[in-house]
Amino acid sequence: MKTLGEFIVEKQHEFSHATGELTALLSAIKLGAKIIHRDINKAGLVDILGASGAENVQGEVQQKLDLFANEKLKAALRARDIVAGIASEEEDEIVVFEGCEHAKYVVLMDPLDGSSNIDVNVSVGTIFSIYRRVTPVGTPVTEEDFLQPGNRQVAAGYVVYGSSTMLVYTTGCGVHAFTYDPSLGVFCLCQERMRFPEKGNTYSINEGNYIKFPQGVKKYIKYCQEEDKETQRPYTSRYIGSLVADFHRNLLKGGIYLYPSTASHPDGKLRLLYECNPMAFLAEQAGGKASDGKERILDIIPESLHQRRSFFVGNNHMVEDVENFIKAFPDA
């Protein structure tokens, strides 16, 4: 049995900037995940379910667990003195860690993706993305350090809190998964160099919004539902409502996750920096593809911290199919 800590140290030579700091940073995220795992499992007993009464910068009602997870992860990262600052879905602006001007890394995160599912005991997750800062070491970080394209990520991953808790990450040398053993308090390696299956047959989208989707996406959904033995259609529809949970299922079973633009969200709804980019990095490392329907996600130059984007991620052939439909059926 190999633990996450042992695996990271063993693979450190594959990382061109290996100094031990990234290992410590991932260890801090691991600690935060353990704390979140512990308290999610007793959320109904300690009054951290439901809405907090506050809204985040996007105007979304914050769940109590959103704020709880944000504070726990922030504290875990701050305590190690190896992160110069963070950006979070739950923070209006970047958080600069005073006294950590010497640190080389910044972290972007969605502390608890799908938190509205907690009340009904459905899987939720944590998403994180790690970059080397671009401003001089020794100075406070600025927003410039966070507004980098996804192709500059040095590591990314997620934690899915479900029937078991799993941490999945990449440093650009494959995707690896670890299952949490609560009796030992450690994450143990369960899958090394994960890959999307060669063919996917699942599409994950909130079809309740069908009438609001662009024409190309509507046509693709109908394509998925049509019978065709040669392409093994119709495909199966599976939608959990948590990006982490839907992505994780499709990574294991094969499929595509779709979150297109709508009239009310013309730029899409998912956040580019701390949702789309890390999942796109993982997808490509697992042999998949991620796009906004027209452009590779990892090549998009971000313009703002909480920028949104349409998002299509999964098996190569499925993402290419939806891109072709979007191109063939443009909205007037």
Swiss-Prot record:
Mg(2+) 1 binds at residues 89, 110, 112. Its cofactor is Mg(2+). Keywords: Carbohydrate metabolism, Cytoplasm, Hydrolase, Magnesium, Metal-binding. Pathway: Carbohydrate biosynthesis; gluconeogenesis. It is found in: Cytoplasm. CDD domains: FBPase. Signal peptide: none annotated. GO terms for biological process: fructose 1,6-bisphosphate metabolic process; fructose 6-phosphate metabolic process; fructose metabolic process; gluconeogenesis; sucrose biosynthetic process. Binds 2 magnesium ions per subunit. Mg(2+) 2 binds at residues 110, 113, 275. The keyword Nucleotidyltransferase does not apply. It catalyses: beta-D-fructose 1,6-bisphosphate + H2O = beta-D-fructose 6-phosphate + phosphate. InterPro entries: FBPase_C_dom, FBPase_class-1, FBPase_N, FBPtase, Fructose_bisphosphatase_AS. It comes from the Bacteria. One of its GO terms (molecular function) is magnesium ion binding. Pfam families: FBPase, FBPase_C. Gene3D superfamilies: 3.40.190.80, Fructose-1,6-Bisphosphatase, subunit A, domain 1. It is an enzyme of class 3 (hydrolase). GO terms for cellular component: cytosol. Substrate binds at residues 113-116, 206, 239, 257-259, 269. Its EC number is 3.1.3.11. Homotetramer. Belongs to the FBPase class 1 family. This is Fructose-1,6-bisphosphatase class 1. It comes from Klebsiella pneumoniae (strain 342).
